[in-house]
Amino acid sequence: MRCLPVFVILLLLIASAPGVDVQPKTKYYVPRASRRDFAKKTPKRLSKLRGCCPRSFLCCR
């Protein structure tokens, strides 16, 4: 029964803690959707830079 008051106090402290993001959004933060779009656009950019070649698997997509 000694642990019950300590447990209640800990619950009250946790409940009153502010809801703050642990990891702040910095200039390096990239959402997952942007990563997917970047992965789709990269082969197109490479094919435009090098021109279309039949031996490369990244060309002409």
UniProtKB/Swiss-Prot annotation:
Lineage top rank: taxon: Eukaryota
Tissues expressing the protein: Expressed by the venom duct.
InterPro entries found in the cross-reference section: T-conotoxin
Domain statement: The cysteine framework is V (CC-CC).
Membership in a protein family: Belongs to the conotoxin T superfamily.
A GO CC term assigned to this protein in UniProt: extracellular region
Main location: secreted
Subcellular location: Secreted
Name this polypeptide is given: Conotoxin Vn5.3
Keyword Disulfide bond: yes
GO MF terms held by the record: toxin activity
Keyword vocabulary terms for this entry: Disulfide bond, Neurotoxin, Secreted, Signal, Toxin
TM helices/strands, residue ranges: none
Residues in the signal sequence: 1-19
Mod. after translation: Contains 2 disulfide bonds that can be either 'C1-C3, C2-C4' or 'C1-C4, C2-C3', since these disulfide connectivities have been observed for conotoxins with cysteine framework V (for examples, see AC P0DQQ7 and AC P81755).
Residues that make up the propeptide removed upon maturation: 20-50
